[in-house]
């Protein structure tokens, strides 16, 4: 919603065996300004972040972040470790904030914070929340929410919902090994 304007896009995302993403707009409605100036730029940023070089520099790993355990919490009914994360470099795709790690499966279930580098001069601050859900054997994005405070235009809220996952076992096996090996 921007200037009391709304926009919506339904986008099919495909992720190949290397992790690179492609996007296909299925339908769109609402404000052309919001779709073209905000949503399409977000899609392009996600495509860029999925490319191999950028992906390695933005993974939530000790190579890219410093971690500090701050406590335990229950997230979506599951016991979780809460860690503070601080990026080691300034990168628009890195987040400064907290992560929730499932205490049983050690998967990241939630990320909250702000970008390590401000995405634009025109934006004062951005708060983001990423939520993940288990889909079969995998933890995949379920919802991304962000609130940007712009210098001139005020507050912009964006919500992205992920659903209808189709996982190709052939691609998974090519990246991770045979499925039968996982159960051992």
Could you say what each language-model-derived stretch is?
Residues 1-96, 103-107, 116-126, 133-140, ...:
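Structured extracytoplasmic
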């Amino acid at each position: 919603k921007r200037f009391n304007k709304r926009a919506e896009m339904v986008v099919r995302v495909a992720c190949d065996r290397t992790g690179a993403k492609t996007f296909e707009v299925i339908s769109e409605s609402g404000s052309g300004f919001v779709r073209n100036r905000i949503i399409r730029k977000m899609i392009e940023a996600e495509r860029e972040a999925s490319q191999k070089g950028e992906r390695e520099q933005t993974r939530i790993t000790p190579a890219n972040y410093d971690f500090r355990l701050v406590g335990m919490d229950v997230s979506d009914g599951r016991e979780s470790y809460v860690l503070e994360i601080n990026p080691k470099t300034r990168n628009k795709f890195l987040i400064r904030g907290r992560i929730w790690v499932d205490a049983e499966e050690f998967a990241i279930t939630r990320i909250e914070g702000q970008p390590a580098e401000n995405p634009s001069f025109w934006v004062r601050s951005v708060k983001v929340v990423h939520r993940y859900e288990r889909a079969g054997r995998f933890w995949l994005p379920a919802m991304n929410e962000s609130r940007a405070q712009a210098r001139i235009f005020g507050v912009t809220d964006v919500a992205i919902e992920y659903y209808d996952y189709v996982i190709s076992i052939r691609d998974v096996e090519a990246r991770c090994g045979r499925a039968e090996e996982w159960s051992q």
